[in-house]
């Protein structure tokens, strides 16, 4: 292993024309500065961290791109049906679009989030949720956006940002429930109310625990506290280079 690292170090030195530890140090500082400035800009921007959702009545419930239509057909083939199409404004007339699918027993919800990309493409992220008889909320997702905040104690969240396969994500979600010997029960509220309640709960909890500033102070100090910004910065590194988020269980 040592000789492999030495060979890589020599190759990197030849490529950059500098001593590799110095290169890595400068690169680390540049990456840190970039991410820290981006986090600070998000903190003081008008973009909501926990946007409120509304029913999507625009008719644009699912993008008509072949690769995205295949996902919809796969969901239907698994016995999942769409129960609601939602949207949330994140600023400047830009909307997050969400389509919620549910199984016949109403014990599993699959939230498909459409993320607009800078190049005009549309990214997909999935959030799978089940509620147990003990009141626990099992969440398995592949969101690539850092959260780094706090979840309620009865939320058991596993993030797998490098898993782009919905089939494998669903398999993992079911395996988690099976391993915990947890029995999923039917949802008692419709997706819109459940999602907005969850957003409000996350805002409240993260304000209480010091991840976010209290609402009256956000105009002067931004939304995210210094401790919160550090947590976000750390999670960005973990997502980008380790493919995993902080442990939330």
List the model feature ranges, each with a label.
Residues 203-249:
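Intrinsically disordered, low-complexity regions enriched in serine/threonine
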Residues 33-98:
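N-terminal topogenic membrane-targeting module
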Residues 1-3, 13, 17, 51-63, ...:
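Intrinsic structural disorder
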Residues 1-46, 235-238, 247-249:
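Alpha-helical transmembrane spans
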Residues 72-216:
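Structured extramembrane domains adjacent to transmembrane segments
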Residues 3, 35, 173, 213-215, ...:
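Histidine (H) residue identity feature
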């Amino acid at each position: 292993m040592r000789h492999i690292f030495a060979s890589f170090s020599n190759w990197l030195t030849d490529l950059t024309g500098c001593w590799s530890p110095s290169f890595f140090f400068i690169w680390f500082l540049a990456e840190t500065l970039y991410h820290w400035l981006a986090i600070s800009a998000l903190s003081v921007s008008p973009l909501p961290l926990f946007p409120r959702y509304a029913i999507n009545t625009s008719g644009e419930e699912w993008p008509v791109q072949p690769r995205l239509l295949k996902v919809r057909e796969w969901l239907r083939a698994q016995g999942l049906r769409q129960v609601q199409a939602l949207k949330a404004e994140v600023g400047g007339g830009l909307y997050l679009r969400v389509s919620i699918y549910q199984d016949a027993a109403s014990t599993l919800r699959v939230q498909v989030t459409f993320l607009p990309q800078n190049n005009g493409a549309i990214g997909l992220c999935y959030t799978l949720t089940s509620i147990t008889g003990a009141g626990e909320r099992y969440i398995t997702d592949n969101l690539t956006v850092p959260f780094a905040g706090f979840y309620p104690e009865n939320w058991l969240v596993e993030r797998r940002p490098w898993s782009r396969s919905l089939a494998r994500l669903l398999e993992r979600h079911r395996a988690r429930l099976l391993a915990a010997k947890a029995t999923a029960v039917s949802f008692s509220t419709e997706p819109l109310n459940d999602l907005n309640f969850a957003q409000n709960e996350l805002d409240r909890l993260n304000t209480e625990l010091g991840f976010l500033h209290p609402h009256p102070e956000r105009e002067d100090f931004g939304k995210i506290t210094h401790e919160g910004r550090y947590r976000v910065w750390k999670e960005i590194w973990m997502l980008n280079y380790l493919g995993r988020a902080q442990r939330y269980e």
